[in-house]
Amino acid sequence: MFNRIISLFLLLFTGQVIALDLELTQGINSALPIAINSFGSDAAAQEIGNVIENDLTISGQFKIISGPQGANSQSSVSTLRQLGADSVVTGRVNQVGNRIEVSFTLADAVANGNILLTKTFQINANQVRALAHHISDEVYQKLTGERGIFSTRIAYISVQRNGGRSRYSLEVADADGHNPQSLLVSSEPIMSPSWSPNGKSISYVSFEKKKAEIFTVSVETGQRRLITSFPGINGAPAWSPDGQHLAVVLSKSGTPKIYDVDLSSGSMKQLTFGNSIDTEPRYSPDGRSLLFTSGRGGSPQVYRLSLADGQISRVTFEGNYNARASYTPDMKHIVMLHREDRQFNIGVQNTGGGPISNLTFSGLDESPSVSPNSRLVLYATRYQNRGVLGIVSIDGRIRMRLPAREGDVQEPAWSPYLS
């Protein structure tokens, strides 16, 4: 189901509206071969091993090597090296009173089992999955030199329909799609979730009062704050990198325009002007500019607004519809929703310009959101007539679907790194 912003653009510009376990759908051959030895046979040990394997698979940087003895046994580093593993993770789980002790080692199988990393943790039973993600982060950073993204989270909108009624919920889950928790539930639409830079709050659009309003909500406490409630459109909130401002879309003066809201004082400043529709603002990571979607050129395209002098320049020229654009955190690429021949796919363009390359090809993809390490793009798509979430690498060489939930899942947003 395409979101309302897309539908609005299509209606205004064309007069029409176009309407689990991790599943790897495409991989790469250059991934680092790694073996995950069993952490033990009990439920906690098996969950830790499964989560680590899932995490490293999601990253697109690793190829999992299976041992000869099955999932619940440990093999020697030399044996796993013979099977093709360059690195081996081995762990153990023990019960210590009412706590769980988890230890792991990362060995270099190429260098005769040289220990690269070894750590021990004590946790409560409800922290098993979180610790597994942390171990994945440790392994990933040790072997790649980059910070892992497995302890980050994702937000999305879940829609369940029963007869003529719909139930909307703003949910937060682990980066692998597991452990979902509902922050908000409503019989009216919820849209456009966006994480604050510190990962503690999410801004969103609610229609609970039969009109659009922008709120923020605390991820920890659920406490809400009303940001805007003007007549007409209140939409597409996006946080500034310092977390002190929200860029929003308001139609209180007529045509939808982009405004800046100071979250401390509540004061507002209009950023775009003219008669065209301007929407979907996204700050650059350095805070110097905004990307936004506008019809000022005749069709929805991506533009850049310099916050220093207000100058606007067009970014996209390829295709008849480009929208929902955002920079990757490293500012090397711009990821966007790209339409050609009535097919909606996720596209990527170098920040300096050039052609747009498709990362996905289903024709029903939307709402791209980039991981904090700039390597992966989370997006919404359709699979077996349901809304699901997919992940694609920034080079398009690895694609996968996240665990399916009941109902339709849409409008995902990837959190920043969480402390």
UniProtKB/Swiss-Prot annotation:
> Pfam families of this UniProt entry?
PD40 (PF07676), TolB_N (PF04052)
Q: Where are the transmembrane segments?
A: none
Which controlled-vocabulary keywords does the entry list?
Answer: Cell cycle, Cell division, Periplasm, Signal
Record bears the keyword Cytoplasm: no
Q: Where is the signal peptide?
A: 1-19
- Entry GO CC: periplasmic space
Localization per Swiss-Prot or TrEMBL: Periplasm
Q: Which Gene Ontology biological process is one annotated for this entry?
A: cell division
Top-rank taxon of the source lineage equals Bacteria
Question: Family per UniProt?
Answer: Belongs to the TolB family.
Function recorded in the entry: Part of the Tol-Pal system, which plays a role in outer membrane invagination during cell division and is important for maintaining outer membrane integrity.
Q: What is this protein called?
A: Tol-Pal system protein TolB
Q: Which organism is it from?
A: Legionella pneumophila (strain Corby)
The coding gene here is: tolB
